[in-house]
Curated annotation (Swiss-Prot):
Pfam families: EPSP_synthase
Species classification: Bacteria, Pseudomonadati, Pseudomonadota, Alphaproteobacteria, Hyphomicrobiales
PROSITE patterns, per the entry: EPSP_SYNTHASE_1, EPSP_SYNTHASE_2
Its EC number(s): 2.5.1.19
Example of a GO biological process term: amino acid biosynthetic process
Residues binding 3-phosphoshikimate: 28-29, 33, 173, 175, 326, 353
Active site: 326 (proton acceptor)
Enzyme category, top tier: transferase
Protein name (Swiss-Prot/TrEMBL): 3-phosphoshikimate 1-carboxyvinyltransferase
Keyword Lipid biosynthesis assigned: no
Length: 450
């Protein structure tokens, strides 16, 4: 899908207090994996709360193309899986649209099959580096035909029998870790991933839930050793997907910034590898109350009550980056309204997201009167409490859903309106965003609609 065909600009204006109660769509990471593991497992998997954004649906289509049967009955997705080791060679290239997670995880899943699988994506995904996933697959015996710089379109030609490897992940990347573990599912023997910096652990938790022989040990230096025994049986499960913390970030920050707001957000995933933003905002003085913390499907879930707050600038520890990598754009918005300076460092991963997210955020802040400094791996924001003088700019989103939503949040609290050049790609991760924000009282209008 090309989002650039017909861009739809949107403008956010200074809003009165945001109030109400919302339930956030399902977590994107868990939704991708639910379709993948359900499609791979033997028997039936039932999923409620699935995020029905384009990215996740593309992962579902890929699993269908390899033999899984997927249908929706009411609010429940029902999957009849093929059984581990039994995926079929797809007849056409698998099209992942804008979905980096879906593409990279599926490369791991299918790479070790003795078959030929081609991957394509939209203009944004075709610019993103895939080598980080392809290199360990090459070590396992997979042949790769790729565009320059290990980019898509690309084709994987699997070995007759894959070699199990022990792979030390060179950067903090849950996608690389997951791709290697999934490749290990169809590989004889034990595949090991060595992870020096812990990243989101949904793959490990969910594979264990589906019955994989997977163990995790942390050594005395805090390095995780994750071992999976290949060619075991996976069995279908019932999954209720908790609300996505990365999507939660947008209404949450909006409620903190718009004067007089009080918003309750239900059913939010509180996995400790994903809560860096909430922790950082609390350090800045945010009034975020965590209500009814509970376990659902092996994951921590809670409700959040958020009240408008006066924020202070902080230095965010760089080691926190993996637990909030997708939330830095909206944290930069919060920092724009905080008293003093906020320093964010260790942001090199942001350079290879849907856009060069670090540059996109810095340019957007500058266009709206925010005093900020972009370093090679850092961003420093000097805030203006109350948003006085902020806004009035148009932000280039570069087909990036999180840039679009972050700057629309900014416009709700800034003195002057903020416009984003395109809002169509918000549908990749949070199709309900516009309606949900309007329901809380946010003034956001798409061009041509008032």
């Amino acid at each position: 899908m090309s989002h650039s065909a017909c861009p739809k600009p949107a403008t956010a204006r200074h809003s009165q207090a945001l109030t109400g109660e919302i339930r956030i769509p399902g977590d994107k990471s868990i939704s991708h994996r639910s379709f993948m593991f359900g499609g791979l497992a033997s028997g039936k998997t039932r999923i409620t709360g699935l995020l029905e954004g384009e990215d996740v649906i593309n992962t579902g289509r890929a699993m269908q193309a390899m033999g899984a049967r997927i249908r929706k009955e009411g609010d429940v997705w029902i999957i009849n899986g093929v059984g581990n080791g039994c995926l079929l060679q797809p007849e056409a290239p698998l099209d992942f649209g804008n979905a980096g997670t879906g593409a990279r995880l599926t490369m791991g899943l299918v790479g070790t099959y003795d078959m030929k699988t081609s991957f394509i994506g939209d203009a944004s995904l075709s610019k993103r580096p895939m080598g980080r996933v392809l290199n360990p697959l090459r070590e396992m015996g997979v042949q790769v035909e790729a565009a320059e710089g290990d980019r898509m379109p690309l084709t994987l030609i699997g070995p007759r029998t894959a070699n199990p490897i022990a792979y030390r992940v060179p950067m903090a990347s849950a996608q690389v870790k997951s791709a290697v573990l999934l490749a290990g599912l169809n590989t004889p023997g034990v595949t090991t991933v060595i992870e020096p910096v812990m990243t989101r652990d949904h793959t490990e938790k969910m594979l264990q839930g589906f019955g994989a022989d997977l163990t995790v040990e942390t050594d005395k230096d805090g390095v995780r050793h994750i071992r999976i025994v290949g060619q075991g049986k996976l069995t279908g499960q019932t999954i209720d997907v908790p609300g996505d913390p990365s999507s939660t970030a947008f209404p949450l920050v909006a409620a903190l910034l718009v004067e007089g707001s009080e918003v309750t957000i239900r059913n939010v995933l509180m996995n400790p590898t994903r809560t860096g933003l909430i922790l950082t905002l609390q350090e800045m003085g945010a009034d975020i109350e965590i209500i009814d913390p509970r376990l659902a499907g092996g994951e921590d879930v809670a409700d959040l009550r958020v009240k408008a707050s006066k924020l202070k600038g902080v230095v965010v520890p760089p080691e926190r980056a993996p637990s909030m990598i997708d939330e830095y754009p909206v944290l930069a918005i919060a920092a724009s309204f905080a008293e003093g300076e906020t320093v964010m460092d260790g942001l090199d991963e942001l350079r290879v997201k849907e856009s060069d997210r670090l540059a996109a955020v810095a340019r957007g802040l500058e266009a709206n009167g925010v005093d900020c400094t972009e370093g090679e791996m850092s961003l420093t924001v000097r805030g203006r409490p109350g948003g006085k003088g902020l806004g009035g700019g148009t932000v280039a989103t570069h087909l990036d859903h999180r840039i679009a939503m972050s700057f629309l949040v900014m416009g709700l609290a800034s003195e002057k309106p903020v416009t984003v050049d395109d809002s169509t790609m918000i549908a990749t991760s949070f199709p309900e965003f516009m309606g949900m924000m309007a329901g809380l009282g946010a003034k956001i209008a798409e061009s041509g609609a008032e």
